[in-house]
Each structure stands twice: as C-alpha cells, then as structure tokens.
Amino acid sequence: LKALDELTFDNRFARLGDAFSTHVLPEPIAAPRLVVASPAAMALLDLDPAEAHTPVFAELFSGHKLWAEAEPRAMVYSGHQFGFYNPQLGDGRGLLLGEVYNEAGEHWDLHLKGAGQTPYSRMGDGRAVLRSSIREFLASEALHALNIPTTRALCVIGSDTPVWREKQERAAMLLRLAPSHVRFGHFEFFYYTKRPEQQKELGDHVLAMHFPHCLEQPEPYLAMFREIVERNAELIAKWQAYGFCHGVMNTDNMSILGITFDFGPFAFLDDFDAHFICNHSDDQGRYSFSNQVPIGQWNLSALAQALTPFISVEALRETLGLYLPLFQAHYLDLMRRRLGLTTAEDDDQKLLEHLLQLMQNSGVDYSLFFRRLGDESPERAIACLRDDFVDLKGFDAWGELYIARVAREGVVDQEQRRKRMHAVNPLYILRNYLAQNAIDAAESGDYSEVRRLHAVLSNPFEEQPGMERYAERPPEWGKHLEISCSS
C-alpha cells in the first residue's frame, strides 16, 4: 500500500490543451478537517487507509497542498438542462487534479469538488457546502455497494469557511474518483461551437483511453456510441430496479462511461411511487422516477446529434433503437432476481406491473417489501406482507399468481432461496432522513453518524447486529424531505 506522496500521476486530459480545460489552482478552505473517508475508494489508488488520519491528507484535499505532478484543470462543456440547451457550462467549482494510475494499471481521475472559482463559475462562489458533500459521498459509496455503476468518493473535508446558500453554511471539499469525467456535454460543446477538429480530438482521446477495443471495429465511433447506449440502458435499469431517483438528468450530468454522475437532489424511493419527483425545482416532473427511462433515451439522442459529424444519421437512429429493448431486458432480469425467480416466463412483466400498481395504490415501502419477500417461504412471506396493502383482494390475487409462478420452478431449498434473494435485496438503503440525521450531527461538529452510516451502507445486503434502526421504515417527517439543487 502507498502513502499519499507515492501516487503516480499521468495527466492525459490536461495534455489535450487549453481548448478543453483551463489551468486553475484550488482556493484553500480554512481549518480543514477530515469528516469521512472511504477505505474502499482509497484502495482504488492503492492508498493505505491509515493515510486518511494524517495531517497532510486534509491539507491535500482542501486546497492547501498539491502534488508536484498534479495539474489542476477546470473542464469546459455545455449541455441540455431541463430540455433546453445551455451553451457554456463547465467546471464551476470543481477541478480535475490529474489522473492517477494504480498497480493494476487502471487510471482514476482525481476531481476536487468545491475547490473555488474557475472561469466557468458564472455567478457562483465556486464552493460546495458540507451538506451536499456528505450526501454525494454517501450516495456514491452506497450505490457502489449495490452494484450500481457510479463515480466514487474518496473523502469529505470540512472547514470553518462560511458560504451563503438559503442560509449561512460551511464550505467543504469532496474528492471524486472516476475513470473519466467526460460527459455528453463535452461533445455537445464542440459540436454547437462548430469546432470539428477539437471534437475529433476529444473523440479520439475518449476512444483510445476508454474504448480501445472499438478501434478494431470498421466504424470505431459507431461502436463507441453503441457501447455508450448499452451502458446507459443497463445503468438506468439498475436505478429503476433499486428505486434510485437521480433528480437532475441534464446531459452535462451524463457520463460517457454509463456511470451515475453528479449527485444533487437525488433520493431512493421510500414508499413506491412511479411519479415521485425528488427535485423540488422540477415543477413539471421532467426527471420524475418513471421518466428516467425515456429521459435516458432523450439524452442519448442529444449525444447522437453531437456525433453526426462522425456517424451517419441512419446508423445513429438504428443504434438508439437498441436502448429500450436493452433497458427492458436488464430491468426484467434484475426484477426477476429480486422476486426470487430463476427462470423466465412470458407473463413475468405482467406479474411485476401488477405488483408495482398494488404497491403504488397502498404506499408500500419499496425496499423492505422485497427484503421481506425473501425472509420466509413464498406462502408465509405473502401472508406476512398482506397487512401492508389496502387492496387485500387485489394482493391476494397477486399472491396466488406469485406462489404458483415460484412453484413452477420446482422444489427449492428455502435457505438457498433466502440467501439468493437477500444477496440482491438490500436491508439498508440511503434514505433521505438517514442522510439528514448524519448531516445535522456533522454540522454540529460530530462526524460519528456520517461514518457509521457509511459503514452500514457499504455492506447493504448483510444484516449487521445493532444496526436495526438503519433498516426501519422512515418516520412520516422523513418521507417528504424536499431536496433542492443548492449545493
């Protein structure tokens, strides 16, 4: 394992030059201190977890110190926000410190969020607050533990630096890790500013770094776009299967790697609600839970438009057509597993839709339903879960269909079934009220709850003794927390 000063940098994106990013130094925050660190994320850089508790750790990730080989850059990009094109966005408060490669030969971008003003800050102060930094940290590591592709979070560093949002808060910095920070909006920026040479340079860079196998195809750009479509279809299937609502699916928040990117007013479903809107600025419900599926396709078509200089419209259209069938296949596969089914039948989609409608009508807790379904034999589980439903007749009818469906798979060892179902149905999810409790404590200077919650969420499928309160239904106040974009 390495110490912090032993990291090996290789700043490939910075070498593309000033058309793609601007050199900016981070602005330090006052009295930096460690709020929380992720040993699992540190392991991606081969870092010794003990390094998190050294004074230099807080200094490096708060803008006070910088590695000699680091080359901090603010990236330029644009994007469609709530369906409307915004010509210039860019890193308004985050800096790509550089790329580090580990012993396994993997490259990881180090991106410092809340690092101060950049040429792309617009009217912003370039800062991130403790509240939003903790939320992003917990979400990144929780999604990873659920096997949902995501950027990772190495640490949050708190400070005494005041910042103004709806009220005075304290600034913090978060160190985000990802194999790439290239967004759909990077390609859109060079397309709409009519700079085909730079767009080609960006495309060639992305191909060489992240899709080298596509270079062997007759049309490398088309092969790359196809893979971006495939990855995003699979990602959104996982969001829907686990009840994750992103909240701000603008094209500048979409990763070319198909990983969850940029955490704002996100939420996991408590009660199942297909029309749930987690972002209280989203008046029209553009990014509601059920809309994430068509919006994924809309965003891919916005990327396709930006790739028309390199790929024929016909080929792009055909490739976009793969998205929905791929999404459906992944989603149904995940939901069969959540229901404890090991084979596929034609009517499974109907069985699932029927269940979700019943859950919607009765306000049933989405995560706990699936967890409890695996606790006992199908007959006993259905009998136990019945009390959660208002439409008893409807649920009884569904229960009969479900029990018969399971029976058609043959005799199953109940203990094996329980293990198999519990391995895909989490006991612990990042509910907004749990995050809020941890934030309230952290804002008073107590970081123990953030650290405890992070540890619990890092192992969501295993029952953890003494942690029962993290697996409970939310209190009424916890169900309707409105989360804004302010961060």
What are these regions (language model features)?
Residues 1-78, 278, 283-487:
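Regulatory N- and C-terminal appendages and interdomain linkers associated
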Residues 31-34, 39-57, 62-218, 257-259, ...:
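Conserved ATP-binding subdomain of kinase catalytic cores across diverse folds
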Residues 251-252, 256:
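Catalytic-loop Lys-Pro-X-Asn motif of eukaryotic-like protein kinases
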Residues 157-159, 245-247, 361-366:
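Short, highly charged low-complexity linear segments
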Residues 7-15, 112, 116, 126, ...:
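N-proximal short alpha-helices
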Residues 1-7, 17-22, 98-106, 120, ...:
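Phosphate-binding glycine-rich loops and adjacent basic patches that engage nucleotide phosphates
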Residues 25-26, 125-127, 222-223:
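Short, contiguous strand/loop micro-motifs
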